[in-house]
């Protein structure tokens, strides 16, 4: 237990250092840019009203030395003070208010997509492993390979054109409407988001299960006369947990990248959409906040994965 606690503390310290490094790099990359976010806000009024220009710079703290801006930003992070939006349509709004709208939407999209991917990918991977080299195995693996390798930015417009425009089965955009309309809006983005993940899970689970089924303890269990269902679900299934945990990192990366693509194609007001909008409008405080938020989420999930590894496999703690 002491080894586990020491391992967890070391990983926690590493997590904090990584988040601090990401925060620092993101801050200085945006602040050292030659672009002045205040000038586009005033436009032609800048020449006739320079006082407003300096007032806005003071409001956003841009008139302070860079080191003081950095320390002020770090001091505000524990209080969720992420600065104020510099984009004209949301000028002066706290960045955290914008994130409070986008985070639940992205979490909902990601959770439903992940659940659907698990419900499809794991059973397909299981059947493929149990029916190795059969027609079912080859067919399912081919389909999973296709949906895994085709990127969402290719699938999304094709699905919108065919399913939404030509067949008119589902809406091509929107999110959050009440009742049946809201459910119909969710179907296409969730299915497209889950498709690649399902293929990834199916291929990974099949590979892990086939490897475990070759182990000596599986042969011993079968030699003892245990039912095949018990061997598969109890002995083999339990031992696929560790290798399955190894794909959490790639899964998180896929979720982050997929959210950017799917949310923008379907007009979903999540973190991905907010980030892309901030980049196109050069809204640096929002870019900083979303970058730090997404990076922290990925690093934290990897931290939990490391702790899980150490919990189920004591050799990792050494």
Residue positions per predicted region:
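Small-residue-rich alpha-helical segments with characteristic i,i+4
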Residues: 18, 131-152
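Hydrophobic alpha-helical transmembrane segments of membrane transport/permease proteins
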Residues: 19-71, 167-185
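Juxtamembrane/transmembrane-helix interface segments of polytopic membrane transporters
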Residues: 22, 26-30, 156, 160-164, ...
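Alpha-helical transmembrane segments of integral membrane proteins
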Residues: 2-6, 99, 103-136, 152, ...
């Amino acid at each position: 237990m002491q080894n586990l606690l020491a391992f967890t503390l070391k990983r926690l310290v590493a997590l904090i250092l990584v988040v601090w490094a990401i925060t620092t790099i993101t801050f200085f990359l945006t602040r050292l840019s030659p672009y002045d976010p205040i000038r586009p806000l005033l436009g032609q009024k800048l020449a006739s009203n320079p006082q407003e220009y300096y007032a806005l710079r003071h409001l956003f703290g841009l008139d302070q030395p860079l080191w003081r801006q950095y320390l002020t930003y770090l001091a505000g992070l524990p209080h969720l003070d992420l600065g104020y939006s510099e984009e004209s349509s949301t000028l002066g709004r706290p960045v955290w208010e914008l994130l409070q709208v986008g985070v639940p939407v992205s979490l909902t999209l990601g959770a439903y997509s992940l659940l659907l991917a698990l419900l499809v990918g794991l059973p397909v991977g299981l059947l493929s492993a149990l029916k190795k080299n059969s027609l079912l195995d080859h067919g399912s693996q081919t389909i999973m390979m296709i949906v895994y390798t085709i990127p969402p930015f290719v699938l999304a417009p094709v699905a919108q054109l065919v399913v939404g425009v030509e067949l008119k089965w589902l809406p091509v955009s929107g999110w959050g409407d009440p009742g049946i309309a809201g459910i119909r809006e969710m179907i296409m983005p969730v299915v497209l988001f889950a498709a690649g993940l399902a293929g990834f899970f199916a291929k990974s689970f099949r590979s892990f299960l086939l490897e475990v089924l070759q182990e000596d303890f599986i042969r011993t269990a079968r030699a003892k006369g245990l039912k095949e269902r018990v061997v598969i679900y109890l002995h083999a299934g339990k031992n696929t947990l560790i290798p399955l945990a190894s794909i959490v990192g790639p899964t998180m990366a896929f979720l982050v990248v997929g959210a950017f693509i799917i949310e923008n194609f379907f007009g979903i007001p999540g973190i991905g959409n907010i980030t892309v909008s901030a980049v196109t409008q050069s809204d640096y405080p929002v870019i900083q906040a979303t970058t730090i938020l997404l990076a922290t989420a990925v690093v934290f999930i990897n931290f939990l994965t490391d702790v899980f590894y150490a919990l189920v496999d004591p050799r990792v703690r050494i």
